[in-house]
């Protein structure tokens, strides 16, 4: 009997575009979905799957769903972490799990961070609208510059460090905080280590680059957002759980902060009536931080490699520990 492989959430139509599936399709039936599936529609789609390919953590795979997939033999996900996958439930059924490599996603996310900073700081959406409405410059075209401003980085890993280097090139001061930050580590990239409260009080732009965990959930709540300058901008290309979304919406609507650029959301795709769609001075992107051709080339080729090995009865490639 031919195996059935289901590929979920290929929004970008990238799998077949960026890799060769001919050997897999010769040995198995493959169905690729480019729109999200939910509830009974998702269950009906997955019921006959022998192998399942997940794009990051776009579709949750909890134990309650896994228990209903009696034919499931193998799971592959892109990237190296999947917070929406119940790995324990799969391992309990001895279903192997593979993952791909990342590719240059940190470069992509750092670039997007700066695109959002500059887009919001220079009010590029509003300036573009002037021209599409047959207008020219107005009072909102008198724009600030970055030199001499302070960038606050919450987290200074590989992405945060890249963002810091660009800020210094613009002549900005960089301050940073994380639970394990040391003055020496901050100094190594030309930044100053401060407390979280000091960072929020001092920064003209605050950008999040910290790992999501139980201790960082809701890190920026109503109390913390109230510490920010009234014209300060908040940038989040990390994880939505780091910020209390309701508190952010209130802060934007009440104009207690200057604006926000957001790439990550509590539920994705973003629902049509989400309040962030209507908040002032808000720039939204559809979770593009890791969405770059070199990254997806690594994803798709890794998936093909894993599936070919599985179909040929070879040892699992890049098994999840």
Regions picked out by a protein language model, each given a short descriptive name:
Residues 110-129, 165-172, 302-309, 314:
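Oxidoreductase and adenylate-handling cofactor-binding alpha/beta cores
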Residues 11-13, 34-38, 56-60, 79-82, ...:
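Short beta->alpha connector loops
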Residues 1-51, 55-56, 171, 184, ...:
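N-terminal glycine-/charge-rich "phosphate-binding" loop or analogous flexible N-terminal tail
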């Amino acid at each position: 009997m031919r195996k059935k492989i289901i590929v979920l959430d290929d929004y970008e139509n990238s799998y077949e575009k960026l890799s060769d599936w001919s050997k897999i399709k010769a040995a198995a039936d493959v169905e690729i979905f480019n729109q999200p599936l939910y509830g009974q529609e998702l269950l009906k789609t997955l019921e006959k799957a022998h192998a399942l390919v997940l794009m990051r953590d776009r579709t949750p795979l909890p134990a309650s769903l896994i228990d209903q997939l009696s034919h499931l033999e193998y799971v592959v996900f892109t990237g190296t972490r999947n917070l929406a996958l119940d790995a324990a439930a799969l391992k309990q059924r001895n279903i192997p799990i593979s993952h791909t490599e990342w590719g240059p996603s940190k470069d992509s996310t750092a670039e997007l961070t700066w695109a959002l900073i500059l887009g919001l700081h220079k009010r590029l959406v509003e300036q573009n609208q002037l021209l599409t409405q047959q207008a020219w410059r107005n009072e909102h075209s008198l724009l600030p510059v970055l030199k001499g401003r302070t960038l606050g980085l919450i987290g200074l890993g590989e992405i945060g460090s890249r963002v810091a280097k660009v800020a210094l090139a613009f002549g900005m001061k960089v301050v940073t905080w994380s639970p394990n930050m040391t003055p020496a580590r901050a100094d190594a990239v030309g930044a100053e280590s401060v407390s979280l409260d000091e960072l929020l009080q001092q920064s003209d732009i605050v950008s999040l680059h910290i790992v999501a965990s139980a201790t960082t959930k809701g890190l920026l709540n109503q109390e913390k957002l109230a510490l920010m300058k009234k014209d300060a901008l908040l940038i989040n290309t990390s994880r939505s759980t780091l910020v209390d979304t309701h508190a952010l919406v209130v802060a934007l609507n009440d104009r207690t902060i200057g604006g926000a650029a957001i790439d990550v959301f509590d539920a994705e795709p973003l629902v049509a009536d989400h309040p962030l769609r209507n908040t002032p001075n808000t720039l939204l992107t559809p979770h593009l931080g890791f969405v770059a051709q070199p990254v997806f080339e690594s994803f798709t080729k890794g998936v093909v490699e894993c599936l070919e090995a599985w179909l040929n009865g070879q040892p699992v490639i890049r098994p999840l520990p």
